[in-house]
Amino acid sequence: MLSAADFDPKPRRASVAVDVGGVIVGGGAPIVVQSMTNTDTADIDSTVAQVAALHRAGSELVRITVDRDESAAAVPKIRERLLRLGMDVPLIGDFHYIGHKLLADHPACAEALAKYRINPGNVGFKDKKDKQFAEIIEMAIRYDKPVRIGVNWGSLDQDLLTALMDENAAAGSPLSARQVTREAIVQSALLSAALAEEIGLPRNRIILSAKVSQVQDLIAVNSMLAERSNHALHLGLTEAGMGSKGIVASSAAMGFVLQHGIGDTIRVSLTPEPNGDRTREVQVAQEILQVMGFRQFVPVVAACPGCGRTTSTVFQELAQNIQNDIRKNMPVWREKYPGVEALNVAVMGCIVNGPGESKHADIGISLPGTGETPAAPVFIDGKKALTLRGPNIAADFEALVVDYIEKRFGRQTAAE
């Protein structure tokens, strides 16, 4: 018979810790949130601005494209500008095709980056593949940088895939093409990691990733990688898509894998709306980790979905205002009020679940539903503290939330 404990997250998979510019990935460290710019890296101003925005939003590592000489030359300048802004955010260089040449030709770039991302599927082809892969690994050893060996099924090593397909065709009970592709993805990562170690890069400088665009495939390849190695793992559903589809797909895929103790760093690869906010992917990554109980980034606002008892929009507007205020103030609150990210706020719309949910929160309000007495009890630390009445209930509650934060979390600052 199953017990309640059977539904808790599985223990984190034991993985080798990797230091990425002072941020620890794996080894039981908190799961790291990362993101990637979509600027032309050679455009220093726009790249610095976007890296800064992503970092302020909570991205602990930021990847930038390094695709040509101009981009490579810009990297140390970008790093310097960020440091002048007080942002010591580790930058990851995303290399494809000519990474070996760019790192060799631009030593300042090689030094400024905190990690190199290598794609085994396009690091080189035929007889040049292992040679050019080795050149990047040797640069990582020279500059003492970790690497992420990032396999992507959109650019999978075709020689390896063809060999496995041929082998499978000759088998007595052949697997499906999809299963063979999954195996090729996993083997590409593991064989590349083994080659990197053979060249001399230690395991504590290697992170692996296997990215696909289908939920079931992501679950499969990362479960296979986790079973066959103890490398730190980077999770991400590539080409997840736009809007709610991308969010749902990424959450479903990574949520399952994380629940099984797999994953040391995550990136949510959302396609932004035209002129949209790139930081949305950081927020979604944080929310995945927070709702699953793995990390705390911002106070949680619980709010009911509404029903026929809540024809007023007051509770919806209040919940939105509080959520927006929290996001806006967190950069300051995080420093001023240590521990504030653990705060739970409830904004409920009627008497059915309102009082109960509010009691479970640190501070909560149960607004009157349709036909109910126009009064809103406020609960603080599980007890009814007061009742708000009148036309300014929402504004009064917002002030109470700020007051609660100052009194509870400000004490720590004052005592230091």
From Swiss-Prot:
Domain of life: Bacteria
HAMAP family associated with the record: IspG (MF_00159)
UniProt xrefs under SUPFAM superfamilies: Nitrite and sulphite reductase 4Fe-4S domain-like (SSF56014)
Organism: Rhizobium etli (strain ATCC 51251 / DSM 11541 / JCM 21823 / NBRC 15573 / CFN 42)
Pathway info: Isoprenoid biosynthesis; isopentenyl diphosphate biosynthesis via DXP pathway; isopentenyl diphosphate from 1-deoxy-D-xylulose 5-phosphate: step 5/6
Organismal lineage: Bacteria, Pseudomonadati, Pseudomonadota, Alphaproteobacteria, Hyphomicrobiales
Record field: catalytic activity: (2E)-4-hydroxy-3-methylbut-2-enyl diphosphate + oxidized [flavodoxin] + H2O + 2 H(+) = 2-C-methyl-D-erythritol 2,4-cyclic diphosphate + reduced [flavodoxin]
Residues involved in [4Fe-4S] cluster binding: C304, C307, C350, E357
Keywords associated with the record: 4Fe-4S, Iron, Iron-sulfur, Isoprene biosynthesis, Metal-binding, Oxidoreductase
Family annotation (PANTHER family): 4-HYDROXY-3-METHYLBUT-2-EN-1-YL DIPHOSPHATE SYNTHASE (PTHR30454), 4-HYDROXY-3-METHYLBUT-2-EN-1-YL DIPHOSPHATE SYNTHASE (FERREDOXIN), CHLOROPLASTIC (PTHR30454:SF0)
Gene name as annotated: ispG
E.C. number(s) listed in UniProt: 1.17.7.3
InterPro entries recorded: Dihydropteroate_synth-like_sf, IspG_bac, IspG_bac-typ, NO2/SO3_Rdtase_4Fe4S_sf
Obligatory cofactor(s): [4Fe-4S] cluster
GO MF: 4 iron, 4 sulfur cluster binding; 4-hydroxy-3-methylbut-2-en-1-yl diphosphate synthase activity (ferredoxin); 4-hydroxy-3-methylbut-2-enyl-diphosphate synthase activity (flavodoxin); iron ion binding
Protein's GO biological process: isopentenyl diphosphate biosynthetic process, methylerythritol 4-phosphate pathway; terpenoid biosynthetic process
Protein name: 4-hydroxy-3-methylbut-2-en-1-yl diphosphate synthase (flavodoxin)
Family: Belongs to the IspG family.
Pfam families for the chain: GcpE (PF04551)
UniProt cofactor note: Binds 1 [4Fe-4S] cluster.
Reported function: Converts 2C-methyl-D-erythritol 2,4-cyclodiphosphate (ME-2,4cPP) into 1-hydroxy-2-methyl-2-(E)-butenyl 4-diphosphate.
